[in-house]
Amino acid sequence: MRKLLFIVTICLPFGYALAQTQPSPPRPAFDAELAKTVGADEYGMRGYVLAVLKTGPTPMPAGKERDEMFKGHFANINRLASEGKLALAGPFDGVNGWRGLFIFAVSDIEEAKRLTATDPVISSGEMVAEYHKYYGSAALMLVNDGHNKVAKKSF
């Protein structure tokens, strides 16, 4: 019995210590000005429109004309991003005709269609877009500025 009492007496403090949880780090302070800048609602979220770019009806063969079309495509992406209309863009692997993604910082599909129509890959028929509304973190609007700080080269 003494051994049991001794073991319990020794082990209790260790069990108590293990049961203590570490306090979670303090949450960053809410920045109302930043929230307004990125269009955040009270949950830090906002509406977007995803445009999934797929292979279109008239793919352009390799050559100078195609190179110019894609040069215009990248210029259009940069323009829309600098205007704050395009939160994110990038390519897919091309499997099943999925070529790329635009995440527009607009909540209306019709506006996203107008923006997409300004892109040479769409107007040429190289790609077509499929649209979906999306509700996500408004912090996504900070990606373009961050990207510019980590990219050595531009398209």
Model-derived segments and spans:
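Bacterial Sec-dependent N-terminal signal peptides
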Residues: M1-P23
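Conserved, structured core segments of small domains
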Residues: Q20-F155
